[in-house]
Amino acid sequence: MDKFRDQTVVEANLFKQLRAIEDFCRKHMFMSGDQDDFDSKNMLTVPTKVIREASLNLLTHRTWWSEARTPSVAIFDDRIEFMNPGAFPMGTSPEEFRRHPHSEPINEKIAGALFKGGVAEGWGRGILNIFTY
């Protein structure tokens, strides 16, 4: 079993949780550089957009009514795992979802707050965006 590098517990409002998750991930990311002529292009090994989308999905689709079912983020040397005890909508497999994405949040008020707060788009394309970034 792989060992993760660090852990933290975040107890804050929804938007502060989002920021804390993103900051936690960035804290452990490495910069990779590409030098082309005189231009140096440095970027995180995992793009910021991927971290944002995965963090939003983690919070939006969390099972909020059970403290025993807490989502988590584990950072390993070769990957980041965003784990949520929630499930895909009834009758939808991950493969089906990739073919026909749609938004079906467990808690519409949480999804609405993130949408109205300008951090989520509400179309159900977050996972697809992760694969294309």
Where are the language model's segments positioned?
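Helix-hairpin-helix/helix-loop-helix acidic hairpins
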Residues: 9-40
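Conserved beta-strand-loop-beta-strand hairpin that lines the nucleotide-binding pocket
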Residues: 1-19, 46-133
